[in-house]
Amino acid sequence: MKRNIAIVAGGDTSEIVVSLRSAQGIYSFIDKEKYNLYIVEMEGRRWEVQLPDGSKTPVDRNDFSFINGAEKVVFDFAYITIHGTPGEDGRLQGYFDMMRIPYSCCGVLAAAITYDKFVCNQYLKAFGVRISESLLLRQGQAVSDEDVVEKIGLPCFIKPNLGGSSFGVTKVKTREQIQPAIAKAFSEAEEVMIEAFMGGTELTCGCYKTKEKSVVFPLTEVVTHNEFFDYDAKYNGQVDEITPARISEELTRRVQTLTSAIYDILGCSGIIRVDYIITEGEKINLLEVNTTPGMTATSFIPQQVRAAGLDIKDVMTDIIENKF
């Protein structure tokens, strides 16, 4: 009998549009001869299943099921592709743990740690991972322009500590830009991270592990035409994504080894993607860890899967079957 798979998308942040795109990508990637696929949209208290005829019906949160005509369909597995809360920060993972429903990505603790950029960076720093200097501001806290310049320097990045897709991010070059950038970041989240700028080559590396194997994908080099890899660059084509990256085999191996180590240190599950900046002297610096990476047809992970000579359908099957 085919397993019923929920591709869980939506969420409660500005990244909802990106999440819904990823859901369509994942729907196209998963083997439909092996699984019954449904996209589940979540936004606040609204949990709905998209039915084949285009209509939607509510999800019963008591057992994660829905009614389709005269049939009750109970989901066997959740492929979480919410970028942001509640799917990337551990909240939804906690629900599925209580329901005893396996899911595609990291558990509660790993998701919570990686969603908090400042906490994740400080945690990995304790294991010898290089990070940039940063400050954390919580709602109601303030910092002077002088402190930012003295402790972090210019240029710097001011961004929401929680969230992704570069919403609310500003590359700050002058003192006059600091406070407006902080206000912009606070409009997206309750915590703001002020991070030192690092110039260099931006790379990203995907990885997943199952009970039988460990797979680290070829690296992608990110060359943006904008000031930085912002939303416009990510989703409107203002970037060159080169897979495999134009770097030495030795540096490639070092980045892949570090990515695998970060996976294990954090206790990850499913597919992750780790972003880096390579600075002078081939120093590898962590930018962030993504535990629910984008999965549209043109996203980094599908590109890297193709470059590795793998079939994305087989990778999706690995992720699902590893939980049974």
From Swiss-Prot:
PANTHER family: D-ALANINE--D-ALANINE LIGASE (PTHR23132), D-ALANINE--D-ALANINE LIGASE B (PTHR23132:SF23). Disulfide bonds: none annotated. It is found in: Cytoplasm. InterPro entries: ATP-grasp, ATP_grasp_subdomain_1, D-Ala_lig_Van_CS, D_ala_D_ala, Dala_Dala_lig_C, Dala_Dala_lig_N, PreATP-grasp_dom_sf. GO terms for biological process: cell wall organization; peptidoglycan biosynthetic process; regulation of cell shape. SUPFAM superfamilies: Glutathione synthetase ATP-binding domain-like, PreATP-grasp domain. GO terms for cellular component: cytoplasm. It comes from Bacteroides fragilis (strain YCH46). It is an enzyme of class 6 (ligase). This is D-alanine--D-alanine ligase. It holds the Pfam family Dala_Dala_lig_C. Keywords: ATP-binding, Cell shape, Cell wall biogenesis/degradation, Cytoplasm, Ligase, Magnesium, Manganese, Metal-binding, Nucleotide-binding, Peptidoglycan synthesis. Belongs to the D-alanine--D-alanine ligase family. Binds 2 magnesium or manganese ions per subunit.
